[in-house]
UniProtKB/Swiss-Prot annotation:
Pfam family, one: Metallophos
Keywords for the protein's UniProt record, in alphabetical order: DNA recombination, DNA replication, Endonuclease, Exonuclease, Hydrolase, Nuclease
Full protein name: Nuclease SbcCD subunit D
Classification via PANTHER family: COMPONENT OF ATP-DEPENDENT DSDNA EXONUCLEASE, NUCLEASE SBCCD SUBUNIT D
Sample GO molecular function, one term: endonuclease activity
Family: Belongs to the SbcD family.
Designated gene of the protein: sbcD
Organism: Staphylococcus haemolyticus (strain JCSC1435)
SUPFAM superfamilies: Metallo-dependent phosphatases
Quaternary structure and partners: Heterodimer of SbcC and SbcD.
InterPro entries listed in its UniProt record: Calcineurin-like_PHP_ApaH (IPR004843), DNA_Repair-Maintenance_Comp (IPR050535), Metallo-depent_PP-like (IPR029052), Mre11_N (IPR041796), SbcCD_nuclease (IPR053381), SbcD (IPR004593), SbcD_C (IPR026843)
């Protein structure tokens, strides 16, 4: 049996004011092209279909068109769980009759112990839910952490699971030790959100979403597909795609990562402002989404405007001087004279030295201040 595992589409994603729908439409078409060749028995989407619980009409239309092609036209059974970005009720709308075409949208805790059986393989779903929601569902006030909440859910499933069959869990959560990125919204505030992978040993495979790195964790059972696109500059140079599982028998499950090439990537460029403007700094693709980390631009008014004229998808700009500058301690200031403090500050801000004229004027102004205090 062949299973395609994907997650974290984040449809409708906006990064620094840039809408990603065009890029998402492109990468979903790439996924569809691959599905036509792969001819999988099941497609699994492990949450965060949308980037917000209130997606736009255009975003919903993109999702519906994609699923229609995959599930209706190509007749691929599809299992979807919600993530922490999704609006549970909106995603769940119509799920009852969708199942007649083998489109299974599972967002309710009530169904966690009801497997979806396809080709004698049981797919259990653990939809994203908050600690308080899981506590209320089990009427258990002793649940305080995600670890405890997850254990409660797994224990509930274990009561009906058949260990002699192939059992796969689909979920959306953080495994302890997994690689994180800036674009992953925390699952909870004020408590540890990660859980131990050992909780899932009753399953033959666990297909997760939430962490965007396709190799977030190395584990024989637990696996992340990663996101379809790079969604933060912490994901620069990170390959994106999906996972392909070949399930031959219980104990014989092989997983392979399949990379998808996006329309545009996120790219970070570090260097001198003038060199970048003059095109002397190599870039992968001028149409990529850029974060520039530059120096020597204090003389330029609104440098990001000039950058966008050459690199239209410039999303952010930072002064590399600030990032590379070692912070001075209070003790440093106490033992340094005022002119030197000002001189060092100017160097930090502009990456340039004061001219003789500027130093002379600073001395004059400092003397005026001292004389007034006297």
């Amino acid at each position: 049996m062949k299973v395609i595992h994907t997650a974290d589409w984040h449809l409708g994603k906006i990064l620094n004011g840039k809408q990603f729908l065009e890029d998402q439409h492109y990468i979903l078409n790439k996924l569809i092209d691959n599905l036509k060749e792969e001819k999988p028995d099941v497609l699994v989407i492990s949450g965060d279909i949308y980037d917000t619980s209130y997606p736009s009409k255009e975003t919903i239309r993109l999702f519906e068109e994609t699923i229609k092609i995959i599930n209706v036209n190509m007749k691929i059974p599809t299992i979807i769980t919600n993530g922490n970005h999704d609006g549970r009720e909106r995603l769940n709308y119509g799920s009852t009759w969708f199942e007649f075409s083998q489109l299974y949208i599972r967002t309710q805790l009530e169904l966690m112990s009801t497997p979806i059986t396809i080709n004698n393989i049981n797919f259990y779903t653990l939809p994203f839910a908050t600690i308080s929601e899981i506590k209320a569902y089990f009427d258990d006030d002793d649940i305080k952490t995600y670890e405890q909440a997850t254990q409660k859910c797994i224990n509930h499933i274990s009561k009906i699971i058949d260990p002699n069959q192939i059992n796969i869990l689909i979920g959306h959560l953080t495994i302890k030790g997994g690689k994180t990125s800036e674009s992953e919204r925390p699952l909870t505030i004020g408590t540890v959100e990660s859980v131990e992978s050992a909780n899932f040993n009753i399953f033959d495979k666990v297909l997760l979403g939430h962490l965007h790195h396709p190799f977030s964790i190395t584990d024989n059972i637990v696996d992340y597909s990663g996101s379809l696109l790079q969604y933060s500059f912490s994901e620069v140079n990170q390959a994106k795609g999906y996972k392909k599982l070949m399930i031959n028998s219980k104990g014989d499950i092989n997983t392979k990562f399949v990379q998808l090439k996006p329309l545009r990537e996120l790219e970070e460029i570090e260097g001198d402002y003038s060199a970048v403007i003059q095109g002397d700094v190599p870039v992968k693709n001028k149409d990529n989404y850029f974060h520039f980390k530059l120096k020597n631009m204090s003389h330029v008014t609104d440098p990001i405007i000039h950058l966008k004229q050459i690199y239209p998808n410039t999303l952010s700009l930072s002064n590399i001087t600030f990032e590379n500058h070692n912070k001075s301690t209070y003790a440093d200031f106490k033992t340094t004279d005022d002119p030197t403090i000002i001189k060092n500050f100017y160097k930090t801000i502009t990456d340039e030295d004061l001219t003789n004229y500027q130093e002379k004027k600073i001395h004059q102004l400092l003397n005026q201040v001292i004389n007034r205090e006297d």
